[in-house]
């Protein structure tokens, strides 16, 4: 019966007339997104991962927009100070049949404000870390915290002391293909239904099943199919993915995304941002080469900050630029302290990236370091539309050679001071040959030749 329902759902999905205004895979180059019928490169950074819970949301979104940002992450998370949970609480216990209207008002307001600014939202339905350790102790889904079910009825644990990679919370094994725990699943579905009640009304939302999951792939599969079916009922098309925990893109976890485009219409490669330097680039390019069909690869969490241990500021900047020059569909600085968020330094790099990509048709370009010679590891990176335009990113000062033999003889060259978000004056350069490029001074630089 379940198999028959899947077939019917797939047939119905294929009959949906896709609204061209909705965020969807770009028809001309499916490694990117389009929104409102136009291709979009998604760039972002923010102070938190669950922005709908913060008090100064409008001002934060305005700041993001002012520096060229158009992309935010939205974990459906409730664990931080000042957050509210999604269910109603009475005398110390939650009722999973009653909503906390404050939570949903915040969520709806967030969707409205981002829509008004054409800021794309990537929802993570299940905020993994809300369901482990101290956060599970206060979570409404913990049987001790609600009036709806008991430990005996659900086999859910009272205490989960381990890290999520140990997958010791049965909450994530409720789906029919695993424990088939219908009592728990009923309320999980109720929560997802309420998310979709609000989000499906908007055209700027992407859906990721989890944050850094290590659980059975049947969990993500169930929710991807569930969300797709609900969207089908609403006669809209949605884009779905999963975010795995492994920092190695070639771990079997990530194969569950690569190998199932019917479930996951895009990929999230955020965990590759634990890699550094040339390896960060090489792994991403190898991962891209394995995509069949080609799909957008998002990078919703770019780690790297002097304040934490996932790399320093320099790593964060480099990862951001390598992601975009490497053909990723999105790049967003992770929240502090693990990332640069939307702090002053992140704002400069966001502004500079938008300045550069507004002056090159990035959607017609491909990564192409083969044009570069006399290049050391991690010295420079190129993205190009051969014969028309090429951009090169330098993480640090230096000199490399670029082969312009397939470009016209008369070209212009212009340097972008990334740290200052400032273009230098254009100069002429002759194509048809190999040309040396030397950064004007220290720091991060990009050069545009066309």
Indicate residue ranges for each PLM-predicted region.
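Active-site mouth of glycoside hydrolases
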Residues: 20-263
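Short strand-edge motifs at loop-to-beta-strand transitions and within beta-strands
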Residues: 433-435
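N-terminal signal peptide c-region/cleavage motif recognized by signal peptidases
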Residues: 7-9
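Extracellular glycoside hydrolase catalytic/binding regions
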Residues: 182, 187-190, 201-348
């Amino acid at each position: 019966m379940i198999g028959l329902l899947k077939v019917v759902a797939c047939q119905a999905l294929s009959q949906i007339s896709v609204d061209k205004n909705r965020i969807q895979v770009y028809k001309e180059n499916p490694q990117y997104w389009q929104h409102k019928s136009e291709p979009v490169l998604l760039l972002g950074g923010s102070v938190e991962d669950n922005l709908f819970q913060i008090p100064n949301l409008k001002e934060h979104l305005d700041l993001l927009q002012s520096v060229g940002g158009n992309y935010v992450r939205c974990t459906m998370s409730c664990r931080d100070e000042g957050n509210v949970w999604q269910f109603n609480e009475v005398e110390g216990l939650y009722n999973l049949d009653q909503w906390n209207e404050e939570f949903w008002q915040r969520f709806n307001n967030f969707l409205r404000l981002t829509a008004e600014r054409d800021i794309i939202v990537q929802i993570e339905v299940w905020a993994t870390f809300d369901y482990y350790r101290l956060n599970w102790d206060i979570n409404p889904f913990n049987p001790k915290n609600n009036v709806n079910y008991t430990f005996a009825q659900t086999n859910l644990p009272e205490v989960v002391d381990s890290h999520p990679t140990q997958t010791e919370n049965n909450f994530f094994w409720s789906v029919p293909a695993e424990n088939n725990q219908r009592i728990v699943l009923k309320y999980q579905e109720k929560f997802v239904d309420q998310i979709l009640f609000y989000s499906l009304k908007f055209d700027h939302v992407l859906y990721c099943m989890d944050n850094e999951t290590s659980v059975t792939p049947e969990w993500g599969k169930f929710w991807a199919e569930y969300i797709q079916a609900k969207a089908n009922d609403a006669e809209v098309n949605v884009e779905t993915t999963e975010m795995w925990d492994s920092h190695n893109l070639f771990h079997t976890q990530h194969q569950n995304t690569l190998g199932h485009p019917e479930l996951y219409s895009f990929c999230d490669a955020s965990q590759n941002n634990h890699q550094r330097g040339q390896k960060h680039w090489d792994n991403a390019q190898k991962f891209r080469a394995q995509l069949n069909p080609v799909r957008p690869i998002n990078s919703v969490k770019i780690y790297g900050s002097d304040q934490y241990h996932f790399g320093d500021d320099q790593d964060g900047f480099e990862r951001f630029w390598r992601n975009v020059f490497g053909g990723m569909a999105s790049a967003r600085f992770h929240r502090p302290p693990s990332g640069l968020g939307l702090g002053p330094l992140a704002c400069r790099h966001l502004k500079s990236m938008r300045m550069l990509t507004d002056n090159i048709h990035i959607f017609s370009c491909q990564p192409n370091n083969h044009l570069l010679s006399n290049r050391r590891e991690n010295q420079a990176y190129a993205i190009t539309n051969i014969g028309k335009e090429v951009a090169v990113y330098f993480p640090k000062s230096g000199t490399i050679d670029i082969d312009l033999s397939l470009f016209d003889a008369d070209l212009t060259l212009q340097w972008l001071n990334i740290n200052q978000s400032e273009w230098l004056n254009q100069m002429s350069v002759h194509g048809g040959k190999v040309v040396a490029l030397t950064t004007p001074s220290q720091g991060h630089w990009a050069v545009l030749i066309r």
